[in-house]
Amino acid sequence: MESKLKKLVEFKELSNLYIDLSEDILKNLIFDLSIKDKQNQLLFINCIENSISSLADHIHTSFSNQIESINHLNFKYKWVELSKLETIKNVIQKELDNDGMIEMIEDSKKRILSINNNNLISSNKENDLKKFSLILNKYKTFNELLRKILEEC
């Protein structure tokens, strides 16, 4: 006897829930380099990644007949696959570029996980409230633009 998992939350709702969580976490970040704050920074990034991944899954449902399954991919490569769709290619490609939102997320995560070496002279800028707010704002703009495009299609 096979049992099927019941879908409790739609991808779109899940994406919104993760954004709400990331907004709450951002309010409590203080960027003091403490372990607790670094964990909260990672939690913020993780929520953004999960939201982006859920949004990709939501969009994939609209184009499932034009593109293969993306369920096995991480958040970035889901968007790489979705960028092959002519309808939304330009919007997605902008965020995959070096100065795009997805690169900013990956860079921020690397900075959180990197071990500081005081013997090296480097110009690496630490994560800060401005950068995390920018990531969140870019994502919200990206999200709204994609939803408007999908509504028009």
What are these regions (language model features)?
Residues M1-L8, H58, T87-N98:
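Short charge-dense sequence patches
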Residues L17-I25, C47, S54, K138, ...:
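Amphipathic, well-ordered alpha-helical segments in soluble domains
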Residues F31-S34, H58-F75:
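Short acidic alpha-helical/loop segments enriched in Asp/Glu that coordinate divalent cations
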